[in-house]
Amino acid sequence: MSRSQLWAAVVLLLLLQSAQGVYIKYHGFQVQLESVKKLNELEEKEMSNPQPRRSGLLPAVCHNPALPLDLQPVCASQEAASTFKALRTIATDECELCINVACTGC
């Protein structure tokens, strides 16, 4: 294998790896990191919205049609609010995501 072929293979591998995305697994749910970032955006918009919030057991974001598809099953859970909170916490912790090589257990 020539040096240019090896370089092309490395670049292709990196592109494929980044295209797959990062997934978070929590209590039987598997969601994309990008979906949790979108969840944060939606919740920030909900907080800044002066309209009255819906009452009920479900978090308000569960009523938002822009909620990513992989997060919608969480809304069917009785622990939806605590699950969303945990996902947001995990998404902001570099060691939980194994982004930082200095973290143990990655």
UniProtKB/Swiss-Prot annotation:
Question: GO terms for CC?
Answer: extracellular region
Q: Which UniProt keywords apply?
A: Disulfide bond, Secreted, Signal
Per the record, the major location class is secreted
Single Gene Ontology BP annotation: cGMP-mediated signaling
Can you say where in the cell this protein is located? Secreted
Kindly give the Pfam families that the UniProt entry links to this protein: Guanylin
Record keyword Amino-acid biosynthesis present: no
> Propeptide residue numbers?
22-91
Q: What does this protein do?
A: Endogenous activator of intestinal guanylate cyclase. It stimulates this enzyme through the same receptor binding region as the heat-stable enterotoxins. May be a potent physiological regulator of intestinal fluid and electrolyte transport. May be an autocrine/paracrine regulator of intestinal salt and water transport.
Q: What family does the database annotate?
A: Belongs to the guanylin family.
Protein's recorded name: Guanylate cyclase activator 2B
Species name: Mus musculus
